[in-house]
Amino acid sequence: MMRIVIFLLTNLAVMVVFGILLTCVGTHSSNTVRLMIISGLFGFCGAFISLLMSKFIALRSVGGKVISQPQNETEHWLLNIILNQAQKIGITMPQVAIYNAPDMNAFATGPSRNNSLVAVSTGLLQNMPRTEIEAVIAHEISHISNGDMVTITLISGIVNTFVIFISRFLAQLTAGFIGSNNEESNNGNKLVYMIVSTILELAFGILASIIVLWFSRYREFYADAGSANIVGCDKMIAALQRLKTSYEPKVTNNIKIFCINGYQKSLSEFFMSHPPLNKRIEALRYGTYMK
């Protein structure tokens, strides 16, 4: 709840600062005020809808099935491990789901520490020793305990507000500077506005995604450290080493950011949701992020 309050106050502060700056430079108008409100609402609403529906969206994306009543020994074991770790860390027992995928993977999502979901792939259950699965689950439990899913979603909402407002505001200025007031020019102004706003939204959207992905990489180190605190550093290192042999995850990008194995081919680490596995292992060995 505190994160959501901070998010609301941050968005409000951003809009107020923009309003003051625009007034100082003499570009404050009813159109600009309307754009500020629309940008803020899109930033708010998009983030909140994504947050509230995160479990539903995640399950639909991977075809996961929630375990309500365990049907076999593996499901019994999985529920017991997650329950024990949740109690140890002091959070409400998450919902538990299994989804069919060959890669060794797991993810956590949900709107709060006490309303969350942990999902594991069949590939993880079939190909990883249980001691290492415990470490993977502890990694996801740490994400929930740290509130990482909520924070990443709220950061996305804030940067989306910036992207929408700045791109459309600059597009308005460009269209107004190029055009005039006759009818033919007004049609041209609209075209200029659409082209410029689209280009700027794409460009600023890339910059915004770099910010969100940086935060995601940063929090992965702390989730690894949290897992090491719960089950031991050796188990977490062994799990990460085994993930090197896994298939590339087949989940969608909005889910991949929450997976323990977010491997992806990229020209630059800037566009990766997870740090390279070797860096994560090195951080654990040196205790860089251990509390």
Curated annotation (Swiss-Prot):
Keywords (A to Z) from UniProt: Cell membrane, Hydrolase, Membrane, Metal-binding, Metalloprotease, Protease, Stress response, Transmembrane, Transmembrane helix, Zinc
* Bilayer topology term: Multi-pass membrane protein
**A Pfam entry, by short name:** Peptidase_M48
InterPro entries documented for this protein: HtpX_protease, Pept_M48_protease_HtpX, Peptidase_M48
- Please list every transmembrane segment annotated in the UniProt record, as residue ranges: 4-24, 37-57, 147-167, 195-215
**Where on this chain does Zn(2+) bind?**
H139, H143, E220
For this record, the Gene Ontology CC terms, alphabetical, are:
plasma membrane
What's its EC? 3.4.24.-
Could you tell me where this protein is found in the cell? Cell membrane
Free-text remark on how the cofactor is bound: Binds 1 zinc ion per subunit.
Task: List required co-factors.
Answer: Zn(2+)
The record places the active site at E140
Tell me which PROSITE patterns the record gives.
ZINC_PROTEASE
One of this protein's GO BP terms? Answer: proteolysis
Q: Which family does it belong to?
A: Belongs to the peptidase M48B family.
Could you tell me what this protein is called?
Protease HtpX
Q: What is the lineage of its organism?
A: Bacteria, Pseudomonadati, Pseudomonadota, Gammaproteobacteria, Candidatus Palibaumannia
Coding gene?
htpX
